[in-house]
Amino acid sequence: MTLDYDENKPLKAFVFKTVADPFVGKISMLKIVQGKLTAGVSAVNATTGETVRIGKLLKLTGKKQEEISEALAGDIAAVTKLEASTNDTLCAPEAVAALAPTEFPQACYFRAVNLAGGGDEGKLSGAIRRLLEEDPTLKYVHNHETHQRMIGGLGDQHLDVAAAKLKSKFGMEVKMSEPKIAYREAIRKPVTIESKYKKQSGGHGQYGHVKIEFESYDGDELMFCEKVFGGAVPKNFFPAVEKGLQEAAEHGSIGGFPVVRLKATLIDGSYHPVDSSEMAFKTAASMAFKDCMKEAQPYLLEPVDSLKILLPDDKQGDVMSVLSKRRGSVLGMNSVGGGMTELLAEAPEAELGDFALTLRQITQGLGEFTSEFARYDMLPPGTEIKS
C-alpha cells in the first residue's frame, strides 16, 4: 500500500495511542495518513468493519487541548469517546483498507490483584480495562478456578506503573500477590467401592446403593460408564449417579483440587421401589467417590507450560542453567540471526512466577519469552504447593 500523505485522497487515519482520562473518558490519538478528518462526520473502522462517528476533534499541545474542526494528512489529532482501539484504522467508506498494526510484546509477568482495603471488585475490573485500552501490553484475566483476578505485564516495574495509574487516575489502591497454581488430583490405584445411602424418617425414606469401580485413564475429564446387569440399578438413576460423581470430583482429598484422569464404572447396586430417588443415588455416588480418594493413593498434578525464549547467543548457557534449577527442560533451539537464539523449552507453571525478571536480568533486557499451557504432569514428592 502506497501512502503519500495527500490530503486530497480518501481518509485514512491510524489510531496509535489511547489515553484513559478519568474526566473526559477515552481519548484516541490518531495520525492522519491521507485525506482529512473532520469533526462530526462518520468513518469506517477497517479493523472491525463498523461505522463510527467522529466526535470532538482536538489538537494536543502538552497538557493543553484545543478543539479544531479538521485535521489534514500528516497531522496528529485526538478524538474523544471514539469507538476504536489502538491499532485500528479509520477510512472513508469508498476506500476501506486497514494499515499494518503495531506489534506489541505479550504480557509475561502476572500477579493477582485486589483492592488494598477491600471493596467493589467490579469497579476495579472496570478501571483496569480502561488501562488496557491505553496499554496493549497489559493483560487482565479472571481465573475462575483459583478465584483470582490477575494482571499481566512485561515485568514488576510495568505493573508498579499500572498500580500507580490506578491510584492517581481512579483513586484505587491495589495490592498484588503471587498467583495461585491450578493443580489437579488423580489416583494411582484402581479400587472398587460399595456405598449405601439409607435414611428413614416419617413417611418415605431415602435409599441408594451403588458399587463402582474407579481407575485411572488418559483423558482429562471424568469418564462415567455402567455395566449393571439385571436391573440392579434402574437406568433412570444412572444420570444421578454420574452427576454425584462429577460434583464430588470437583474437590479432591489432598488440596481440594479437581480430580482428573478418572474412570468410574457403575457395576452393581440396589434400589427400593418406594424410597429410592435421584437424590439418594447422587448422594451414594458422592460417598463412594470420597471413599475412593481415601483408598486409591491420590497424587497431585501440576500444570506445565511450553516456552519460546528469545535470547542473545552468548546467554544460552546461563538461561539453560536457570531452567534446569526450575525443573525445566530444553527441547530445542533455533538461530534467528542478529546474534539471537530461540530456545524451546518446558517448565512447571509454579516455577515461572518471576522468570521474566530473571531472564531480563541475565540478558540485560534483551531476552523475552512467551508461554502457553502444555499439559499436566505429576508433582514430584516433597515439592511445595503454591496455592
Cite the ranges covered by each PLM segment.
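Structural and coupling elements of P-loop NTPases
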Residues: M1-S387
